[in-house]
From Swiss-Prot:
InterPro entries: ARFGAP/RecO, DNA_rep/recomb_RecO_N, NA-bd_OB-fold, RecO, RecO_C. SUPFAM superfamilies: ArfGap/RecO-like zinc finger (SSF57863), Nucleic acid-binding proteins (SSF50249). GO terms for cellular component: bacterial nucleoid. It comes from the Bacteria. Keywords: DNA damage, DNA recombination, DNA repair. One of its GO terms (biological process) is double-strand break repair. Involved in DNA repair and RecF pathway recombination. This is DNA repair protein RecO. It comes from Roseiflexus sp. (strain RS-1). Belongs to the RecO family.
Length: 283
């Protein structure tokens, strides 16, 4: 019989208020995604306050409850403090957390997904290139969850892909060879540079991505291709992308105060949106 109290390594990926003083917390653990409750965590002098912040890598002590397991202790292992001083990196962390929240099954063991998210937060905290880190994260996470886009064989006919002019089809699950370009009339054009970058990021360790020197045009193209692929799986864009795009735009054109105001408006919506749940048919 399972012990009534157990310990697990976890990353805090979502929070919301419950009752007068509790917090509902969604965590990613090596054993999958799980919703737990932190009793009294919103009270001023709660010993849990500050120990269940978003994106914190922590060791939790949980008591098995009737409906939700209860957080009895949290011992942070890494708060990723440097990440929290950069608004664009915070937005990237929100996006990374939202993807696992939407795609990882509840209480379905996936140690690799946990490791990928943890590695991504570490890379963002260490100052790695944000966009390339996220592209590598997307590709590795999709692979771990059974959504790996086909980049070495044609997604339609299975022929080995060459460095010819290929197209990318979210509907068929990856790149199309020239002979199959007409299979999906909505397939996206894909440059050779973007094709090579996607294959490289898919095949290399996550931490390598931050060391690459890639042109802005190729970076933007690969982002667009993977957004289209994820949009097909999730049936809409992740909510956090709108904030990340706003931050990037304002960093180029506005003052830091304007960026801070946008963050306040976005995060005033709360850490969670109960409508942002698992997409139908995504698994």
């Amino acid at each position: 019989m399972r012990d009534r109290v157990y310990r697990t390594e976890a990353i805090i990926i979502r929070r919301s208020d419950a009752g007068e003083a509790d917090r509902l917390v969604t965590i990613l653990t090596p054993l999958g995604r799980q919703r737990v409750v932190a009793r009294g965590a919103r009270k001023l002098h709660s010993r849990l306050a500050g120990h269940i912040e978003l994106f914190t890598h922590t060791m939790l002590m949980l008591a098995i409850g009737r409906n939700l397991h209860i957080v009895t202790q949290s011992s942070p292992l890494d708060r990723f403090e440097r990440l929290r001083t950069d608004l664009e990196r915070i937005g990237a962390a929100y996006y990374a957390a939202e993807l696992v929240d939407r795609l990882v099954e509840e209480e379905a063991e996936n140690k690799r997904a946990f490791s990928i998210l943890l590695g991504t937060l570490r890379a963002l905290n260490a100052g790695a290139a944000i966009d390339l880190t996220l592209r590598a994260y997307e590709l590795h996470l999709l692979d771990a969850l059974g959504y790996r886009p086909q980049l070495y064989e044609c997604a339609a006919c299975g022929a080995v892909l060459t460095e010819a002019t290929n197209r990318f089809s979210p509907v068929t699950g990856g790149a199309l060879c020239p002979d199959c370009a007409g299979v999906d009339r909505l397939a996206l054009p894909m440059s050779l540079a973007a094709f090579k970058l996607l294959r490289y990021l898919q095949s290399q360790p996550l931490e390598i991505s931050g060391e690459l020197r890639i042109s802005p045009a190729t970076r933007a193209e690969t982002e667009s291709l993977l957004r289209a692929y994820l949009r097909h799986i999730l049936e809409r864009d992740p909510r956090s992308l709108a904030f990340l795009d706003d931050v990037r735009q304002m960093l180029r054109t506005s003052s830091p105060a304007s960026v801070g105001s946008s963050a306040t408006r976005y995060f005033a919506q709360g850490d969670t949106d109960e409508n942002d749940r698992d997409p139908p048919g995504a698994r």
